[in-house]
């Protein structure tokens, strides 16, 4: 099978802020950092990019600026999810001709739709655009699980091309591949099990760890996709503390603090109701950065 457009180490990029406002100069530097590090793709304004506390106008501007800064050197995936189908469609339409390579759309959160509701939600979004759509299943945050059987149904829609699975349940991968087809893209949304998912036929990871270990994550994924799992595992083990400890508090709280400690962004701040990493958690994240050899 040919290498799909969406593969390897795709960073779920933080949105840098100064005094509560998006810092576009720092965003430009972050995009350049990932291009130079070999990152295979950028998710702009996903969960890690604080999508829920940006306005629609800010969402669109950040994504369009990310496309501008990337300048065709790396595919940009737009976070366009919402728990209101109509809002997700508005976001998707606003970005259809923006230069993004595709959209990542989270399972509707809080309102807990049925499997049929999720199917109709994604079907309506896909029919509103020609852009490739990636489903995003993260039941620990949404309260709802997009079942493999529903993913299989959605895979029949031509521009629904893949799924980001953030359950960490590796038993789902072969079932999804069976129901959705071998060409359906499976991207792990769980750094700790990302390499294992690639051993089972997954194509990559949409990664939080990549924010602070971009070159290592890119190399690990390249080795894994080449079948060099022992070499990939050596990198993975060095990063394992990060994979876990960047979730010691709700994402993206720890990763923004870690990026700040590495000098990648000038402030670790987030918009309320998210707050900066607690003093009690900081030594744990610092130790993980040290174990990874990043400081």
Curated annotation (Swiss-Prot):
It is found in: Cytoplasm. Pyruvate binds at residues 48, 206. The record marks 47, 110 as: Part of a proton relay during catalysis. GO terms for biological process: diaminopimelate biosynthetic process; lysine biosynthetic process via diaminopimelate. It catalyses: L-aspartate 4-semialdehyde + pyruvate = (2S,4S)-4-hydroxy-2,3,4,5-tetrahydrodipicolinate + H2O + H(+). It comes from the Bacteria. SUPFAM superfamilies: Aldolase. GO terms for cellular component: cytosol. Its main location: cytoplasm. Its EC number is 4.3.3.7. Belongs to the DapA family. Pathway: Amino-acid biosynthesis; L-lysine biosynthesis via DAP pathway; (S)-tetrahydrodipicolinate from L-aspartate: step 3/4. Gene3D superfamilies: Aldolase class I. Homotetramer; dimer of dimers. One of its GO terms (molecular function) is 4-hydroxy-tetrahydrodipicolinate synthase activity. It comes from Actinobacillus pleuropneumoniae serotype 7 (strain AP76). The gene is dapA. This is 4-hydroxy-tetrahydrodipicolinate synthase. The keyword Nucleotide-binding does not apply. Keywords: Amino-acid biosynthesis, Cytoplasm, Diaminopimelate biosynthesis, Lyase, Lysine biosynthesis, Schiff base. Catalyzes the condensation of (S)-aspartate-beta-semialdehyde [(S)-ASA] and pyruvate to 4-hydroxy-tetrahydrodipicolinate (HTPA). The active site is at residues 136, 164.
């Amino acid at each position: 099978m040919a290498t799909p457009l969406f593969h390897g180490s795709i960073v779920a990029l933080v949105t840098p802020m100064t005094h509560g406002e998006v810092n576009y100069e720092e965003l430009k530097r972050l995009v350049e950092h990932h291009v130079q590090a070999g990152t295979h793709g950028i998710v702009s304004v996903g969960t890690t990019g604080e999508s829920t506390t940006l306005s629609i106008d800010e969402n669109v501007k950040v994504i369009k600026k990310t496309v501008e800064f990337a300048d065709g050197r790396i595919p940009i995936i737009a976070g366009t999810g919402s728990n209101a189908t109509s809002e997700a469609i508005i976001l998707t339409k606003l970005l259809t001709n923006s230069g993004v390579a595709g959209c990542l759309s989270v399972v509707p959160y809080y309102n807990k739709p049925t499997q049929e509701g999720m199917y109709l939600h994604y079907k309506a979004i896909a029919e509103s655009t020609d852009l490739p759509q990636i489903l995003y299943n993260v039941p620990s945050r949404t309260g709802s699980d997009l079942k493999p059987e529903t993913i299989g149904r959605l895979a029949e829609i031509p521009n629904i091309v893949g799924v980001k699975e953030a359950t960490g349940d590796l038993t789902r991968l072969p079932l999804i591949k069976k129901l959705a087809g071998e060409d359906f893209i499976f991207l792990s949304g769980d750094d700790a099990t990302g390499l294992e998912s690639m051993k089972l036929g997954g194509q990559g990871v949409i990664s939080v760890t990549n924010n602070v270990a971009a070159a290592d994550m890119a190399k690990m994924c390249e080795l894994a996709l080449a079948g060099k799992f022992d070499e990939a595992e050596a990198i993975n083990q060095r990063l394992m503390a990060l994979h876990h400890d960047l979730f010691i508090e709700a994402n993206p709280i720890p990763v923004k603090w870690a990026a700040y400690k590495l000098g990648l962004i000038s402030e670790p701040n987030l918009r309320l109701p998210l707050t900066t990493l607690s003093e009690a958690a900081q030594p744990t994240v610092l130790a993980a950065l040290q174990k990874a050899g990043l400081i």
